[in-house]
Amino acid sequence: MTSYPYDRAALRTSLAALDQTPGVSKPDAILAADDVVRRFGGMTAVDVDHVEIQRGAITALIGPNGAGKTTFFNLLTGFDRPTPVSGRDRASWSFDGRSFSRTSATKVARSGMIRTFQLTKALTRMTVLENMLIGAANQPGENLFVGLVKPLWAKRERENVERAEELLRRFKLDAKRDDMAGGLSGGQKKLLEMARALMSNPSMIMLDEPMAGVNPALTQSLLEHIETLRDEGTTVLFVEHDMHMVRHISDWVIVMAQGKIIAEGLPEDVMNSSAVIDAYLGAHHDRDLGDDDVINTEMIRTIEEQVREETR
């Protein structure tokens, strides 16, 4: 087993040696899913045979509008349930060796797998600090004995506040500590949601479009925070449609289309895959998704806007 935090060069060398095919086994998978299907009426939103997420890496989950990325996130984190399919094995997935197939969203989060949402969930009528404290594990009120013994709950509450203030400084939100969360900008709410997710010291964080609605001034800050998470040993799985971001920070890329995993590999290889480009651009599969000339076209801007509507 590899020691953590990872050395990125060693990680990329390890991943580069893999067979870049859908469902490939990882050297040290923290999350593995099998036979996960979700149908809505006659439409199949997710149909994943097998996929693994490498521990300690930044993995991007990409795909065109309606690919099933957010639905897959919802299934893995207990916000939705798979559809039983006759003649197929029952859906199963495990996190850090523990089965999560029938685990509630609350228990998933307490087990170390935290997610954020494309539309931020900041509690607007609470202060920034209060929002942070909600994300803390082992709240004093969760244990009757601790709640009745003041020295115990006071100590835990003080530790939670110290942790929250540390994270607010790290995310440069400390000046907003006592402000109402509803007064934050869209980008600041993204930072708050990511910071709050770290209150419970997760082993893995799942980010659903972390850059959606973020102005360029905060984009670089978010990128640096995501890379710092990886450098500290936290596994990151994120949905994103900014191909430059995907190429810049990802160690591994998984591609979904029509609910299925159609490709996996290193970012530079996936971006040049004709199957992946075809999934985004149809017949225009002579283009590299990471090229400036492609990203700046009206076609890509239109596709990105359509993709952002996926979970609205």
Predicted features and spans:
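Glycine-rich phosphate-binding loops of nucleotide-dependent enzymes
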Residues: 2-312
